[in-house]
């Protein structure tokens, strides 16, 4: 059975949803990361992700300038750090260093991987477009990595107000 509902009520029923970190690198070498819920796989040949990133996010600026980024699926142990990445702006803050998380070199891009993530995907920017008020970024996956510990669980967003578990 269905009933008419305001969009906010209907959107509230989508949880739990995935959350990823879009990792970028500033010109001065700082590691920047942003928590993103608007993400999906849009192609498997070639493999591609689509991200919705609010403008004027520092992450979006870095992706536009560098043409590369990493998508990391944080573990359930990273809720505090993921919340930090999603609520603090990177223009003037060294988010990578202040998070306390470990980053390691990637294979094909000049952006680090999140060492203890469930999975990391090295991406090159394919295109960006704006069908509504939020820019959409498409990145082609050029390398992927998984955690060697299969018991590491993925972090999910369980509701409005950053209910990360």
Residue ranges, per PLM feature:
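Basic, polyanion-binding surface patches
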Residues: 1-165
């Amino acid at each position: 059975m269905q009933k008419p509902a305001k969009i906010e009520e209907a959107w509230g029923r989508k949880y739990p949803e995935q959350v990823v970190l879009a990792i970028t690198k500033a010109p001065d070498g700082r590691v920047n990361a942003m928590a993103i819920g608007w993400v999906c796989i849009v192609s498997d040949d070639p493999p591609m992700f689509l991200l919705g990133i609010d403008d004027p996010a520092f992450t979006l600026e870095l992706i536009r300038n560098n043409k590369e980024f990493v998508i990391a699926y944080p573990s359930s142990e990273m809720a505090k750090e993921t919340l930090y990445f999603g609520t603090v702006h990177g223009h003037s803050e060294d988010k990578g260093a202040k998070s306390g998380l470990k980053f390691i070199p990637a294979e094909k891009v000049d952006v680090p991987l999140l060492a203890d993530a469930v999975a990391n995907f090295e991406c090159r920017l394919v295109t960006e477009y704006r069908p509504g008020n939020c820019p959409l970024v498409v990145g082609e996956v050029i390398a992927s990595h998984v955690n060697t510990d299969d018991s590491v669980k993925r972090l999910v967003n369980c509701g409005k107000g950053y209910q990360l578990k």
